[in-house]
Design a protein with these regions (language model features):
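Well-ordered, non-membrane alpha-helical segments in soluble/globular domains
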Residues: 18-31, 65-79, 106-118, 140-147, ...
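Aromatic-lined glycan-binding groove of carbohydrate-active enzymes
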Residues: 70-154
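Short loop/turn segments at strand-loop or loop-helix junctions that form parts
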Residues: 1-5, 47-52, 92-97, 134, ...
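A structural motif corresponding to the C-terminal end of an alpha-helix
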Residues: 30-43, 74-89, 118-128, 181-182, ...
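Catalytic-face loop-and-helix region of soluble metabolic enzyme cores
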Residues: 120-218
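Active-site-proximal, glycine-rich beta->alpha crossover segments in alpha/beta enzymes
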Residues: 1-72
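Active-site-proximal flexible loops/turns
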Residues: 55, 99, 196-197
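Short, solvent-exposed loop/turn segments at secondary-structure boundaries
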Residues: 11-14, 102-106, 197-201
Length: 218
């Protein structure tokens, strides 16, 4: 999403605001051109919202002052409203994955739930899915309890609880806890594959298959 592309590089808040607004419009225009060139039923657009997710934790002393949600509110309809209805659009709420580590560890899923409720209800078009990360060591009720506060209608939820380190068994353990608060969801890796060691990709894919089987097992 726009702030994730801009805010790391412009540390003066005034500069960041000016560039963000221009970049947001440019990104929306680029997405429209993609939609003109690619058959709509072959296209899925996933907004990667990293800065938008971690900025609330006040990690960066150059982050603009004020309510971060106000900035998210300004960009949310602009980037998605012009996308044709036939195109699938979703959000990945990201805490970063450099060196297999987050910028900050999420306390629980409350921030992801808050952001999900906001983007689904304020994008000006249908949002088909949201993705939320789950650290490997979180199989406690406190992490998943905020899922009860989701207000996103029929939007799909994917929990990034699949990790190659503990495979399908670890995913199943986390699934069982999450289902106490959200009975139906899909599963995914915690973040993208782009920075992974290639040797870990096949074990992670196998873990996905085993986790998916766990979802369909009573």
């Amino acid at each position: 999403a726009p702030q994730s592309a801009v805010s790391w590089w412009f540390h003066d808040p005034d500069d960041a605001d000016r560039v963000n607004s221009t970049y947001t419009l440019a990104m929306a225009d680029e997405v429209r051109r993609l939609c003109d060139a690619i058959p709509h039923d072959d296209l899925t657009i996933q907004w990667d919202a990293c800065w938008e997710t971690v900025v609330f934790d006040q990690l960066f002393d150059w982050a603009p002052s004020g309510d971060p949600m106000e900035r998210i509110a300004m960009q949310t309809p602009v980037i998605s409203m012009g996308i044709p209805d036939e195109v699938v659009v979703g959000y990945h709420f990201c805490y970063g994955s450099m060196h297999d580590e987050h910028f900050v560890e999420p306390t629980d899923l409350s921030r992801c739930v808050e952001l999900s409720n906001f983007v689904v209800n304020n994008s000006g078009r249908r949002i088909e899915f949201v993705h939320m990360p789950v650290p490997i060591d979180r199989d406690d009720d406190a992490y998943y309890a905020p899922l009860r506060d989701l207000r996103i209608g029929g939007c799909g939820v994917y929990l990034g609880l699949v990790h190659y380190e503990d495979g399908g068994e670890g995913a199943k353990r986390r699934i069982e806890v999450a289902q106490r608060y959200l009975p139906h969801f899909g599963v995914a890796a915690e973040c993208g594959f782009g920075r992974m060691d290639p040797a870990d990709v096949v074990p992670l894919l196998i873990a996905h298959s085993e986790a998916a089987d766990s979802l369909s097992t009573p």
